[in-house]
């Protein structure tokens, strides 16, 4: 099964709503929640870690994470939407934007996705984490 829809919008732009709608319409959708739900076996985390560290244009086995999906929205797929479009040239691209603009998107992101980093407990834990 090949990707038919590729999301180019970042998280906090309605991607979870789009993903829910696509799933209901029969388009199994890959979203950041898939990465988080698969972290126990690390297969998705390891794949995306490699993508982040490889030079752009490195050949990839996209089916390793997208097997069984017809759509991808949100992170991490939105960060490589151009590569995905090259791999799936018949796919359509969906761009989601925050309805109140870039500044509102930033505030929303800081208050949710990056909120743990601002907590003092997180700062203490980072001291205890091993460094690579």
Predicted regions and their residues:
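PAPS-dependent sulfotransferase catalytic domain
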Residues: 23, 27-28, 34, 81-132
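Conserved nucleotide-sensing/catalytic segment adjacent to the nucleotide-binding pocket
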Residues: 44-84
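A structural signal for well-ordered alpha-helical segments within the folded catalytic domains
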Residues: 12, 16, 78-82, 103
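PAPS-dependent sulfotransferase catalytic core
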Residues: 1-61
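Short active-site oxyanion
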Residues: 3-6, 68-71, 92
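Short His-Asn-centered micro-motif
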Residues: 7-9, 33, 73-77, 97-98
């Amino acid at each position: 099964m090949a990707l038919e829809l590729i999301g180019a919008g970042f998280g906090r732009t309605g991607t979870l709503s789009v993903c829910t709608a696509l799933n209901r319409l029969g388009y199994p959708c890959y979203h950041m929640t898939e990465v988080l739900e698969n972290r126990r076996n690390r297969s998705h985390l390891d794949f995306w870690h490699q993508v982040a560290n490889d030079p752009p244009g490195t050949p990839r086995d996209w089916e390793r994470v997208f097997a069984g999906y017809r759509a991808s929205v949100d992170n991490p797929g939105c960060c490589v939407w151009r590569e995905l479009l090259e791999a799936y040239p018949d796919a359509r691209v969906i761009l989601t934007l925050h309805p109140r603009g870039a500044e509102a998107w930033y505030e929303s992101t800081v208050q949710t996705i990056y909120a743990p980093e601002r907590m003092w407990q997180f700062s203490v834990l980072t001291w205890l984490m091993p460094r690579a």
